[in-house]
Amino acid sequence: MLKIAICDDDAGDRERIAEDLRVYAAAHQEHSIEMTVYSSAFAMLDAFEKAGCPDIALLDICMPGMLGTELARDILRCSENTDILFLTTSSDYAVDAFALHAADYIQKPYTQEKLSASLDRVIALRQERTWLLLPCEGELHRIALEDVLYIETDGKRRSFSLASGRKLTARLTAAQLQDCLAGRRGMI
């Protein structure tokens, strides 16, 4: 199941993006796409607090109350595993978007082919990632191995420092940690 969220304050744009995503999902049923649509950044953030962040977020940038780049920053604070694609009429925020490691920056009006090509690329990259499941604070956290900067050890406590600045702590034995990282390039 691939969770994709759309956030755009313009009803016409929101419906167009949703329809284009439905067309994409119908042509790529192997991805089993679940779509949610939001009309404001605040509605999207409220939903994420309850249900967790999506795998991919399609965000407008110029929205009342909160820019899409600010929304992306908030999303990435709670989930560094969410890929962000910006769909916007403005070219003014491209540098900010890529500073957030946006997967793409698509200017409106766009074509179905452009959105599909971008989604194909992002989904292919997601499938190539190596994922770790870490038991932290009573929950399982799924993190991309490439996001782990370093691991600190204190007894059975392992603190994983992530590229986002977040730190996750898991209780793992040395053997469990070794199993978790076995065969992963760059890890000792």
Each model region followed by its residue ranges:
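Conserved Asp/Asn-Gly motif in the active-site loop of CheY-like receiver
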Residues: 35-43
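A generic structural motif
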Residues: 25-35, 81-82
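Conserved binding/recognition cores within well-folded domains
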Residues: 117-188
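Short, well-ordered amphipathic alpha-helices
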Residues: 15-25, 44-45, 72
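Conserved SAM-binding loop
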Residues: 6, 37, 86-87
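CheY-like receiver
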Residues: 43-128
